[in-house]
Amino acid sequence: MSSPQEREELDKKVDFIIKEAAGENPAASEYLYMLSTCGRIVDDIFDQDVEVTRQNLLTLTEVLFVRIPSNTFYREHQDFLFSQHVVMWNAWDISNVLIDGNQTDKIYAHVLRDYIHEILPLVALLTQGHNKMKDISSLVRTLFHKELGD
């Protein structure tokens, strides 16, 4: 759950990290923006803290069923990326269960809910190599760091 100001701040971070991770690959950038859009809509559906419109649901459907599968970067690296989609979804899904558990479960939930960020170093590896992957991995930890309970 976030305020409009927090969302605006997060959007700036997302714009920055996507440009860094995708480098000069516009299809990789488009792919990451699509994932970001889907992640935001799904989070809004789950949290029920922001109205999800009919248009949001249509966008989500189009991106998942048409735009991502036809994205050239995704198609070229589908074997790597699809497995990450499965892991991202599974990690986010279980984080929503663990958040209601004991203190240890809450810590796991805190980490697992943001597993979606792990796609960024992978995209950097695929577009710019190992060193950029390491840079993006460190940058993700800085940009999206949250205190426990946030």
Where in this protein do the model-derived segments appear?
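All-alpha prenyltransferase/terpene-synthase fold signal
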Residues: 1-150
